[in-house]
Amino acid sequence: MKKILLASVIALAAATASADDYIEHQVYSDKNFEQNRAKAVKLLEKRGYQIHKIDADSHWGKPVLEAEAYKNGREYDIVLSYPDLKIIKEKIDY
């Protein structure tokens, strides 16, 4: 029974990782990706951030852009929905 449970957990983890990779691939394959990325940079710069990097990722199974940015000497982790670029999460990275 323990072996079956362990195998199930491993299979589920692999399937989840595969789904996340597929979502990332979809974002990077979007023909408007570079435009949307540039819009995200401008949006965050207007809010006073200096952008360190922005990458495609998934958040709760949805495509997002994850940004590392600095403001007032502090580092922030910011998650924007993709492609509409609404801020989902904005927190100080300790």
Regions found by a protein language model. Give the residues of each.
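A short, surface-exposed interaction/processing loop segment used at functional sites
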Residues: 85-94
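Cleaved targeting-peptide boundary
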Residues: 18-27
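Short, non-transmembrane alpha-helical segments in secretory-pathway proteins
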Residues: 27-53
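Classic N-terminal secretory signal peptides
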Residues: 1-19
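Conserved histidines in hydrophobic membrane contexts and catalytic metal-binding motifs
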Residues: 62-68, 79, 85
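Short acidic/polar mixed-charge low-complexity motifs
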Residues: 72-76
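Post-signal peptide N-terminal regions of Sec-secreted extracellular proteins
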Residues: 20-21, 46-49, 94
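Amphipathic, hydrophobic secondary-structure cores in small proteins
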Residues: 52-55, 59-66
